[in-house]
Amino acid sequence: MYELTGDQKWLPLAEKYTEDLDSVQYLTWHHDVGFMIGSSYLNGYRFAGKEEYKPVIIQTAKSLSTRFRPAAGVLQSWDADKGWQAERGWKCPVIIDNMMNLELLFEASKLSGDSTFYNIARKHADTTMANHFREDNSCYHVVDYDPETGEVRKRQTAQGYADESARARGQAWA
């Protein structure tokens, strides 16, 4: 709301709800940390100049980077050995939603001077472009990779109508 209106009344609320997410910066078991912190701390840093948010952004990039699988060139979205994801037989599932994390990695690279974050984001984007899109430019929800060889194992959906259907939310993020 603050970005949209510029009305200062929104700042205290934005800061309160942002700072409630402080512990998220240390999570390494899923990819959502990038957009959770990007939509909160990164926006707080950009719009309100909150210098104290910089370390949180950088730490989140470090945590997210632990999900990078170099042989496949992607950030693994979900752990494949727990919950419903384990039932799918995936090894390194990557969802198109993961593209939302790249902004945080690019910004963390600028803020920290560490090009590792930039390189991970760029490689993930390039790999996604090569493997997530169909001839008609619609995208798969999930592409499962072999984390050791980088080969694509499966192209599926976890939330869409069918494996070969376009998922509106994923298309928007792509």
Task: List each model region and its residues.
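Glycan-recognition and catalytic cores of secretory/periplasmic carbohydrate-active enzymes
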Residues: M1-W173
